[in-house]
Amino acid sequence: MDIFLTNNLTNKKEQFVPRDKKKIGMYVCGPTVYDDPHIGNARPLVIFDILFKVLKEKFSIVTYVRNITDIDDKIIKSSEEQNISTKDLTEKVSKNFLDDCKFLNCEDPTYQPKATEHIDLMIKMINELIDKGFAYENNKHVYFEVKKFSDYGLSLIHI
């Protein structure tokens, strides 16, 4: 069985040919847990669950990583509006999201890291981007300098 996926850069269907047929890696941006899950959260959840199941049928090892963003401006604002801690808010909303996953019969990802578990690494990576000139600070935010990276969108792995 061949697998074809749409390449967003060319907008054409292309055969999926992995670099290593024994190990497939799949990273999916998960929810930002500031409010109860909605249909917009369910759509990518179901689509990538189907892809995960198809890939597992064809390949030996499929590693599926889906993060949970449990700290950001929306979370802080929502926790302040509800007068609860960000931790209490994100735990409640994460539980609701995971309950919805089970209800939709979606398999658990191989790994489900939370943003707060990797803050130190993120700070280190952000500082490296700033040091290399790929990012800059403005008004207490850090922005990626797209113009400084000619292959932006093609391959960010080499930064």
Region spans (language model):
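NTP-dependent nucleotidyl-transfer catalytic core
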Residues: 1-158
